[in-house]
From Swiss-Prot:
PANTHER family: NEFA-INTERACTING NUCLEAR PROTEIN NIP30, PSME3-INTERACTING PROTEIN. Promotes the association of the proteasome activator complex subunit PSME3 with the 20S proteasome and regulates its activity. Inhibits PSME3-mediated degradation of some proteasome substrates, probably by affecting their diffusion rate into the catalytic chamber of the proteasome. Also inhibits the interaction of PSME3 with COIL, inhibits accumulation of PSME3 in Cajal bodies and positively regulates the number of Cajal bodies in the nucleus. This is PSME3-interacting protein. It comes from Mus musculus (Mouse). Interacts (via C-terminus) with both free and 20S proteasome-bound forms of the proteasome activator complex subunit PSME3/PA28G; the interaction is direct. The modification N6-acetyllysine is found at K138. Expressed in skeletal muscle.
Amino acid sequence: MDGEDDSNLVIKKRFVSEAELDERRKRRQEEWEKVRKPEDPKECPEEAYDPRSLYERLQEQKDRKQQEYEEQFKFKNMVRGLDEDETNFLDEVSRQQELIEKQRREEELEELKEYRSNLNKVGISAENKEVEKKLAVKPIETKNKFSQAKLLAGAVKHKSSESGNSVKRLKPDPDPDDKAQEAPSCMSLGSSSLSGPPSIHCPSAAVCIGILPGLGAYSGSSDSESSSDSEGTINATGKIVSSIFRTNTFLEAP
């Protein structure tokens, strides 16, 4: 009996009586009167009938909440505009940066001007030193040129006699006072016809420079000795032997 009563109770709870429906409708009307606006109807609208099961309705609510959560944390929804305080702060920071950059540029310009002025001073001093060096070197060069020209002045090339090997030499213009003191150089002669060992012939120290007026001419005995300032002898091997003594003696060659 008890089991049957319980089953009947469960079955009864699955159905709603008309009295319960009227009571619910009355409570809903009272609530509607509290929130109703003048343009709203006087009677409370009936509840919409939903034929879906409870599972489907709960799943719908769950999906709706998930969509709201995702929409809240989307990137486009995370971006927001700046307020007035933030914009003022950013403006102040940018202004400070511009001042610092301007000061740095001014310091660089000052350093460049100072460097250029120092460079110009150094360049002018270096140019002055170079000019002074050139002025100091020019007199020395001119002096050397004059001394070389003076040394080369009066140098005359003479051609020796053709009695032996041709020899060319440079000889300054002789001075009449020094001509008597010059040592004549020996030149090559023909092969000696004299028999015996070769000998060295030294011309006489007394060389005739000129004839003074009022003096007679001497005999030609010494003409062979003073005919040339470059006389000499050749030994048996054909080697030129220079005169070393200004005398009339003959020295035997080794």
